[in-house]
């Protein structure tokens, strides 16, 4: 699989690393192969260092199967399963950031009540699990008018939020940008 004809001779290689070296390049990890200047950087031996899994200290964008009646799909694992996996990876922290409750199926008061119930569960975990930091987060929709899908009373219960546009993607560039900046 790793071969090249050069000077009328077939040069074969056992690894990609050997192949790249033959071409005078540093090996480019697959994650970096995006046609954004990595070939030039490899030829100049100036590729950036890739973060290794052991260097990752945590993850703040994790969706659980907690029944918050979200605007989008639930995750597959429970809070406890997520935390146990994070601990097995030696993470220092996790952010439980499920999608917020759907605005088309809940009143603002119902959204706050669902967040309150979820927050109580996360607070119980925070008090019983001491060797990893747990953040109570939500992924919140930015609505078509630029407002957030979670009322301020719900936001106050969170450690933070991830806000994103999940609907009306066909709006014009100016409108979409305005939604993000509101």
Where are these regions (language model features)?
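Extended substrate/RNA-proximal surfaces in nucleic-acid metabolism proteins
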Residues: 1-58, 72-77, 81, 87, ...
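Hydrophobic residues within beta-strands of alpha/beta enzymes
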Residues: 94-96, 182
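Short connector loops at secondary-structure junctions
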Residues: 96-105
């Amino acid at each position: 699989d790793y071969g090249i004809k050069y000077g009328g001779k077939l040069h074969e290689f056992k690894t990609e690393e050997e192949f790249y070296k033959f071409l005078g390049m540093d090996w480019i990890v697959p994650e970096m192969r995006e046609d954004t200047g990595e070939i030039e950087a490899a030829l100049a031996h100036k590729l950036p260092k890739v973060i290794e899994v052991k260097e990752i200290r945590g993850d703040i964008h994790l969706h659980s199967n907690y029944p918050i009646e979200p605007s989008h799909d639930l995750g597959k694992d429970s809070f406890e399963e997520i935390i146990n996996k994070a601990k097995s990876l030696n993470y220092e922290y996790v952010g439980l950031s499920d999608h917020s409750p759907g605005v088309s199926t809940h009143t603002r008061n119902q959204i706050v009540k669902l967040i309150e119930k979820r927050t109580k569960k996360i607070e119980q975990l925070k008090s019983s699990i001491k060797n990893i930091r747990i953040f109570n987060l939500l992924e919140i929709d930015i609505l078509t008018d630029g407002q957030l899908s979670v009322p301020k009373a719900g936001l106050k219960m969170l450690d933070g939020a991830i806000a994103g546009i999940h609907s009306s993607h066909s709006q014009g560039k100016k409108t979409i940008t305005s939604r993000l900046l509101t």
